[in-house]
């Protein structure tokens, strides 16, 4: 939105940055909701047209992650930890992302409800 309004992006090497790999697992649902809401607004991209597609997409992604994890030179407990993390993170990605991607199809009342209860951007604007 800011770029569309004519603002410019600049790089500042001294600016504090909070990278996504530093987020808590509990914040990803809201992050993906906001991200895919924006991806639809800009590119009309939706990861899934219907929620019934999500189990297949989720299983495929978690399987791929687990195949990668199995190849890593780490202990069995650590592999299990990362496999569980993958399951939860990908659940957040697919459900939060699909909710956000379908945002344009919801009534105004539902949009407000979802923004109020999920969106990180909504909370940041209200702060």
Label every model-predicted segment.
Residues 1-16:
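A short, conserved alpha-helix in the catalytic core of glycosyltransferases
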Residues 18-40, 113, 117:
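Nucleotide-sugar-dependent glycosyltransferase catalytic core
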Residues 41-48:
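Cytosolic juxtamembrane regions of integral membrane proteins
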Residues 17-23, 68-73:
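Short, exposed beta-strand "edge-strand" segments with a Pro/Gly-rich flavor and a Y/T-containing core
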Residues 7-8, 25, 54, 58:
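Generic hydrophobic, helix-prone segments enriched in Leu/Val/Ile
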Residues 34, 49-127:
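Non-catalytic, C-terminal membrane-associated alpha-helical segments of glycosyltransferases
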